[in-house]
């Protein structure tokens, strides 16, 4: 029987120590450049990846209970030498990217630049998000669960879904200022408050996520953009990296002796499925074999790469989109379906329509990787690549949503063009989330599991290694603060600042170690879960708890709730105590709805 530790009160410091877990035979692959990857075809690139990353499994045991541990305080007045020694930090975030959508996580999609980062860095196999875009961004940039800071709802505080953070819940750029960092934002925001007021010095706020082919609605440094009269060459994924490179060049010219933090959150591959015609052409008809076959193919690659120790979850044929939009189905025509039916039962028209949507999704991921490659080259040209920590992740799992909004959908328009409005849907979303169950908004593994790639030549000596310890978006702020040698303020206006629940994962960069923590906790729109060690209690909205032993069942197939009712009660108490603690903290301040929050809700 696993022993569970008491969930700490929200004002208790709970900085955890990382202890070695079970030994792992970590294969160190040779360094591989993006240029080498680019010279291969999609199919041969996958074989090269499998050959390079012959990685063994690490057998992860139950996490150890938390032990009280605090870091040594550091002075805000750092020496110039100390400032120079701190790494630059780059966080790249995809939007609605599935766990298996990158080549280095099992995909057939060509992602040579991210694959190269993985081959020369480390990949985390059990990294989690919050299941939705805006709660994940709050967790990533503050180090708190979003429910603690009015950025997602609680049972007794439903008004906190997209409220204004408490003033003590500072974002990462504000915390890094004391260490001499300059911070820049390029891409989606979806956080409360103006960007520049949050510590960023320059910003491109890509707000018009209803059309990838126009800059209308975007903000530069919190001011509206005037779109060019001719936007025929505009595509938001390219524009995001154009701005990121401009910020990097500005920093190199103006602050070359200081470290920088760049936050690059793409909109891609979020719906609407919009991609450049030449990118779509690379994947045209690639997916006519269907989602059932694609899941099997990706799962086999994941097994070959040592990423998973689970079975492949069967498709849940009756689980469709999380929200019903019957009018959208009428507008989209007979090719659209809202269930992941057996591929052989679809009509030829439906198969072509669905395969085309997946081709556009793949094209969006492909283009994102190409633009990341352009940014990586800019880092090399600025001679800062080796001293820059790059973290790549996704805000939630792939989306099963089907809807039509913004400018609507023209059935006569080429799929993927500005006048089309397509969503991936539950069939190929299930393939993108291979090998897990469910999708974005759910807190089963498919909704909350994301790749995490960490690359830092100056600090990560492992090459191509896997990290098996469960980690979460809330861990990134403590990790970065440790590397920057920053101790966050203990007080705000004379009151104690609540301890961040996340843990630094710095030690895991070079060792496959466990991270001490009580639990990991989830709640979104009634979907709820808690993980303690390898035990996970999870339930969809208005359904009973399910219990899984994730040691060999991350596919969440063997529900043990009926067999182990005591375990269910024990884990439910952990979940409830954490929930009560968050409600007590959040209730101290009144959540204020942010402007535009209602519109932003369904993302």
Task: State what each model feature region is.
Residues 17, 28-31, 46:
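Basic polycationic patches enriched in arginine
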Residues 52-66:
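Bacterial N-terminal signal peptides
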Residues 4, 10-11, 27, 57:
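Aromatic (phenylalanine/tyrosine) cluster motif
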